[in-house]
């Protein structure tokens, strides 16, 4: 809505990736004779003051997801469920990358300030996957 089409494209790609992760987890659960259940999803804010705030929010969310995955690994470990631990480690590694990517964007946006935000927008719009 604010004209940052590159950032919007980046977020759309990110969203599609996260949906893929949800499907992977559901498929794994079915293989293990568990029933996937989607509960209510927290309401996402509908507006921010500027793009930095958007990506700061995304960074906090990635940290939250990392914590949840870590907790699942811990439960699997306590249950001596090696298969699930192995499955979850891919997400542990993924979260390290996710947090680093978003932190990098936040850092760049903070350093660039308003004068270079359109350049960063264009760069984010180049994301392929």
Feature map (PLM): residue ranges:
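Iron-associated oxidoreductase/ferritin-like identity signal
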Residues: 1-129
